[in-house]
From Swiss-Prot:
Component of the cytochrome c oxidase (complex IV, CIV), a multisubunit enzyme composed of 14 subunits. The complex is composed of a catalytic core of 3 subunits MT-CO1, MT-CO2 and MT-CO3, encoded in the mitochondrial DNA, and 11 supernumerary subunits COX4I, COX5A, COX5B, COX6A, COX6B, COX6C, COX7A, COX7B, COX7C, COX8 and NDUFA4, which are encoded in the nuclear genome. The lineage of its organism: Eukaryota, Metazoa, Chordata, Craniata, Vertebrata. Residues 1-14, 88-227 are mitochondrial intermembrane. Residues 46-59 are mitochondrial matrix. It is found in: Mitochondrion inner membrane. This is Cytochrome c oxidase subunit 2. It comes from Balaenoptera borealis. GO terms for cellular component: mitochondrial inner membrane; respiratory chain complex IV. It catalyses: 4 Fe(II)-[cytochrome c] + O2 + 8 H(+)(in) = 4 Fe(III)-[cytochrome c] + 2 H2O + 4 H(+)(out). Disulfide bonds: none annotated. GO terms for molecular function: copper ion binding; cytochrome-c oxidase activity.
Amino acid sequence: MAYPFQLGFQDATSPIMEELLHFHDHTLMIVFLISSLVLYIITLMLTTKLTHTSTMDAQEVETVWTILPAIILILIALPSLRILYMMDEVNNPSLTVKTMGHQWYWSYEYTDYEDLSFDSYMIPTSDLKPGELRLLEVDNRVILPMEMTIRMLVSSEDVLHSWAVPSLGLKTDAIPGRLNQTTLMSTRPGLFYGQCSEICGSNHSFMPIVLELVPLEIFEKWSASML
């Protein structure tokens, strides 16, 4: 999860988030090299006393500064498209959970079970226990099995919302009348926090998301106790 004065991303918990971190580093290195080259050229132009005022045409230079940016853009676009298609791919999910956005809480329904659904509200600051996080804790966590492909169906009952969990690389818009889907898979157990990421009204800041990823045996015991 995030911590105060954090400069980087949250620790990756899913294969998608790991790919996004690699892509970020890849793109940042390209930007760093381009910035260094531009800074070097500017410094050279400001410090050199040599001038060349008779140059009217330079086909070679124009060819290079046309082709080189195109190659750089391709090197950025290809891995980006690969990750984009990976995020849209849904292959034989082991579990499907439907989440609906409301003003201002989330409701969840485990569609593979006959009657397993609940609402998830933020716990008010006055009711927090020692060690719990302000504006991030909820009364009902979403319990999910780790190391399994899970399909999330996301929609809204009223206005636009956005269901986002950064450490899993998830951010899916909740749109009234439309059902969006995304997949998640956690490589380790733990608590993972998110929030509504679309301005949805006066209490937009009070719509936290808490996923608790557990081993399959614990998930089965929990689901049996909820039925």
